Amino acid sequence: MQVILKEKVENLGVLGDIVNVKPGYARNFLIPFGKAVQATQANIKAFEAQKAELEKAEKARFEAAVAVADAIKDKVYTIAAQAGEGGKLFGSVGTAEVAEAVSNQSGKKIEKSQVRMPEGVIRSIGEFELTVHVYTDVDADIKVNVVAAEA
């Protein structure tokens, strides 16, 4: 199925590209989430008329994402967690806890789906380097310091 992309989609294309995708991917993800429209002659003409407006909106979203990334990057965020002897945590610190800590300590809204933990969840106290994927092609490297919570 051919679709016209209304925004940049990772591993697929950028705004205005006409790409071939599987019908289920188009019907269940791209079209319902407003990322693409079916590539009919009428939609192609309508898209050409809207292209400048969509590019302007995409640029605004990108600039907002860069501003968020600049505000949160290169900072250390502290998370208090229950820990036993030897610095081993009771449980773990995952993406939800990291997103909440970054949101609270920076004032910028971060979703848990934006937090990238390449080594998996954190299970001990210490300082860890993580990445926050703010937007397509916009990542911010952060440090998370997990400390033992006061009893």
Swiss-Prot record:
InterPro entries assigned to the protein according to its UniProt record, in alphabetical order: Ribosomal_bL9, Ribosomal_bL9/RNase_H1_N, Ribosomal_bL9_bac/chp, Ribosomal_bL9_C, Ribosomal_bL9_C_sf, Ribosomal_bL9_N, Ribosomal_bL9_N_sf
Keywords carried by this UniProt record: Ribonucleoprotein, Ribosomal protein, RNA-binding, rRNA-binding
GO annotations of cellular component type: ribonucleoprotein complex; ribosome
The keyword RNA-binding is annotated on this UniProt entry: yes
Gene3D superfamilies hit by this protein: Ribosomal protein L9, C-terminal domain, Ribosomal protein L9, N-terminal domain
GO terms of biological process kind: translation
Gene Ontology molecular function: rRNA binding; structural constituent of ribosome
Sequence similarity: Belongs to the bacterial ribosomal protein bL9 family.
General function of this protein: Binds to the 23S rRNA.
Name of this protein: Large ribosomal subunit protein bL9
Gene: rplI
